[in-house]
Every structure is written in structure tokens, then in C-alpha cells.
Amino acid sequence: MYVMKQSGWLEVICGSMFSGKSEELIRRAKRATFAKQEVKIFKPAIDNRYSTSSVVSHNGSSVDGIAVASPKDIITHISERTDVIGIDEVQFFDETIIDIVTQLADKGYRVIVAGLDQDFRGEPFGVVPHLMACAELVTKLQAVCSVCGSPASRTQRLIDGKPASYDDPIILVGAQESYEARCRHHHEVPRLDVGTTLDN
């Protein structure tokens, strides 16, 4: 990573499920802690897969965190002594999070957010694309396709072992029993209305 001459910036860690986003957020948070910096980690209250408060990766790594229902709640937990702010599963927050992280970075905090850049349909997910555009540093991670072993950039949602329909709800918090990492060619999203295609 390049050296910042001024304090205060935004880092985005993104990718599909099982690509190591939370793991990378935890690594950066622990590294900052080793450097004697005060770190505060947050996650949306909706994400309670492994813990109601700690940020936990699929591999089992964890760091203490604070679950918040609203992005505005993050502000109440930050002090002048705070150096680094981490936010996991940022895609589950509403657009308020964009203003919050922008203000925090402008005030001199190092802000690190991690989240899915695509939903299960393979389309841009919530606030993440906007945050990527505003960030000084974007790290896009890839998983391994569960079908062919190629680099995977997409998240496959499975319902009873079958690909979820395009019309299913976007938000459905789960873990490996509900989702798999897939490459472009093995990512399946059945649609009732196919619309325009390139086929003749």
C-alpha cells in the first residue's frame, strides 16, 4: 500500500462471498492495533451469523466489534482517540453510510469498509459501488469457484440446492449452506423474463 502524507482516507475491501473480505478487514485492524492505534470495528445488527457483536470470518478469525442498527450509531462510539474505523458487511447499510464514512475520512480517520460488490444476481450491491468510487484504495478479492476451481467473482445463492430465481429478495443473510462462490461461467440466475439476448 502506498504511503499517505495526510491522515484520513477510505479503503474498500470487496468481492464475492468466501473471498476473504472479513479476513482482510480483521488483518488490517489487528495490524493497526499492533501499531498502538485505537481501532473501532462495526457491523450491521442484521449480521448475526457467527456472533451478535464480533466480526468473524468464514475461516473463524475474529475481532471484537460493535453491532449497530443504523450508520448514525457509529458516530456515538467514536472519540478523538480513535485512529482506525472498520465496518464489515457494509452492503447492508442504507445510503446514510456514504455520508458517514466520507465525513469520518474528511476528519482524519482511516476508514476501512468491507462488503459484497455484487448481489446474488451479479448486479452492483447497494452502497458498495458508490463507496468504491469515493475510496483512495480499493481491494477486490476473489474466491474459488465451487464448480470448476477458477477465480470466482460472483456469489451463487442456492435454495434447496438449486439456483435462486432472479426475483428472490436481495437480502438473505446466510453462510455456506445458502451460498457458494462461482465464476462468471458457472453463476446461474434463472429469469422468467429473459429480455434482450445476444443469441440470434
Curated annotation (Swiss-Prot):
Transmembrane segments: none annotated. It is an enzyme of class 2 (transferase). The keyword Kinase applies. It comes from the Bacteria. The keyword Transcription does not apply. One of its GO terms (cellular component) is cytosol. It catalyses: thymidine + ATP = dTMP + ADP + H(+). Zn(2+) binds at C145, C148, C183, H186. It is found in: Cytoplasm. ATP binds at G15, S16, M17, F18, S19, G20, K21, S22, D88, E89, V90, Q91. The active site is at E89 (proton acceptor). GO terms for biological process: DNA biosynthetic process; thymidine metabolic process. Keywords: ATP-binding, Cytoplasm, DNA synthesis, Kinase, Metal-binding, Nucleotide-binding, Transferase, Zinc. GO terms for molecular function: ATP binding; thymidine kinase activity; zinc ion binding. Its EC number is 2.7.1.21. Belongs to the thymidine kinase family. Homotetramer. This is Thymidine kinase.
